[in-house]
Amino acid sequence: DGPTAIFVANTLNSQYLGAIMVAAYSYMALVPIVQPPVIKLLTTQKERRIRMSYKKGSVSQLTKILFPIVVTIIAGMVAPASVALVGFLMFGNLLRECGVLNALSETAQNVLANLITIVLGLTVAGQMTADKFVRPDTLLILALGLVAFVFDTAGGVLFAKLLNLFLPEGKKLNPMIGAAGISAFPMSGRVVNKMGLEEDNQNFLLMYSISVNVSGQIASVIAGGLILTLMA
C-alpha cells in the first residue's frame, strides 16, 4: 500500500523512504504478473470455475453516508494512529455519496488526485539521492516487498479455501477472490475477474473481487496504524 507505507515510514523517520515507496508502487503495478501464478499454484481448475450466487439489491443513501463515518470511528478505536489515513479515504467517499457536494467530489477525484500524485512523487524523489537509494539495502527492501506480496496473495486464497470447508454447496466462495484482499486497488480485483473469465466466460467475479479489494485497502491502513501504535 503506497500511501500507508509512505506515511508509516515517514512517521518513523525511516531513511529508506524512497526505497519503500518504489517497492510499494512497483509491486502494485506488477499485480497482473505476480498474482496469477500464485493463484493458479494454489487452486484447481474446478475451484477457479466456482460461480458465486448474486442477490440483486440496492443500497440506501443513508447506508452510503453512514459507511465512511462508521469505518472512521471503528478504525480510530482499533488503531488511533490510522485515522489520519483512513479519515481522508472515507472523507473522499463521503464527498461522493452525500449528493450535495458534486463540484468538490469531481475536483477531488480528478484534479486534486492528480495534483497530489505529482507532488507526492516530486517530494519523495527529492529524498532518493544516490547515497540513500543505490545501496544493497534497497534490493533487500524490494525482495521483502515481493515476499510480502506473494504471501498476501497466498494467504487470501488459502483462507478462502478454509472457509469453503464450512460452507454448504451452492454457497462456496471462489478462492481466487481471496487474492484480491490487498491494497492494490482496483488492479487486483480486475486481475481476479479476468482470471475467472478465462476459466469460464460467464463467471463474472468483479463485484466480489472489488469488494474484497476495498476491504484489503481499509485493512491495510488500519494495519499501518497498528504498527505506529505498537512502535510508539
Predicted regions and their residues:
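Alpha-helical membrane segments and immediately flanking helix-loop junctions
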Residues: 1-16, 55-63, 167-218
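Alpha-helical transmembrane segments
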Residues: 15-33, 142-152, 177-180
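Juxtamembrane and boundary regions of transmembrane helices in multi-pass small-molecule transporters
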Residues: 20-48, 155-169, 212-232
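Membrane-embedded hairpin module used as a gating/binding unit in multi-pass transport
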Residues: 23-100
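Entry/N-cap segments of selected transmembrane alpha helices
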Residues: 27, 130-157, 209-213
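Hydrophobic transmembrane alpha-helices of secondary-active transporters
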Residues: 92-95, 113-135
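Interfacial helix-loop-helix linkers and transmembrane-helix boundary segments
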Residues: 101-110, 128-143, 160-171, 197-202
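Transmembrane alpha-helices that form the ion-translocation and gating core
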Residues: 122, 127, 143-191
